[in-house]
């Protein structure tokens, strides 16, 4: 079974983490976006791509019960919802295991792209549907620094988790 972390690593490789700022788990409480996104990719030019990772059909379907998605799927509110929730994104994608593609094509609005995680010998992301350009919003230097700060916080949290795991393993020996 494909895990979220497998897709995260493949996304980071695909978007080239050496050339772009890539930060996982950006929540709305951080004041950067109007909703939580699983991965945020910022180019050197200051344009953002958001990615939502789904690893099961139930997970994918549940995403459409979120407030921002309900507003987006309402034909009377679609444009307003796009501007409210997605105005900081140039592109937005769903990243899924390859076997979810038929369901994803049926559920995900056409302006969002779809990446499929291919878990053959070399694990990689395949662009199954190209995202349409949503907005041409250029992030300010202040926004970019804030995202980098969030990325640093993620690194710290991961290092602390590794440290705790190593200490537990040492105690078992």
Which functions belong to the PLM regions below?
Residues 55-109:
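Catalytic cores of nucleic-acid endonucleases
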Residues 2-5, 9-17, 103-173:
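Non-catalytic C-terminal interaction segments of nucleic acid-processing enzymes
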Residues 49-51, 93, 113-116:
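Hydrophobic/aromatic beta-strand patches that form the interior of the parallel beta-sheet core
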Residues 26, 54, 118:
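Residues at the C-termini of beta-strands that transition into short coil/loop
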Residues 37-56:
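Active-site beta-strand-loop-beta-strand hairpin of nuclease catalytic cores
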Residues 1-35, 42-43:
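Acidic-basic catalytic patches of nuclease active cores, encompassing PD-(D/E)XK
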Residues 11, 28-30, 39-41, 81-85, ...:
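Short, flexible, glycine/charge-rich loop motifs used to bind or transfer phosphoryl groups or to couple energy/partner
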Residues 19, 46-47, 89:
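A general structural motif
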């Amino acid at each position: 079974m494909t895990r979220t972390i497998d897709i995260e690593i493949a996304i980071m490789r695909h978007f080239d983490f050496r050339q772009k700022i890539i930060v996982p788990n950006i929540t709305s409480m951080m004041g950067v976006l109007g909703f939580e996104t699983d991965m945020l990719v910022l180019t050197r030019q200051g344009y953002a791509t958001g990615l939502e990772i789904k690893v099961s059909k139930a997970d994918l379907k549940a995403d459409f019960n979120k407030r921002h998605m309900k507003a987006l799927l309402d034909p009377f509110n679609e444009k307003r919802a796009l501007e409210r929730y997605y105005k900081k994104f140039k592109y937005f994608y769903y990243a899924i295991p390859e076997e979810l593609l038929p369901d994803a094509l049926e559920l995900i609005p056409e302006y969002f792209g779809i990446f499929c995680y291919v878990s053959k010998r070399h694990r990689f992301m395949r662009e199954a549907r190209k995202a349409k350009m949503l907005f041409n919003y250029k992030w300010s230097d202040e926004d970019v620094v804030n995202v980098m700060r969030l990325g640093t916080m993620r690194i710290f949290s991961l290092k602390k988790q590794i440290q705790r795991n190593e200490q537990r393993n040492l105690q078992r020996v």
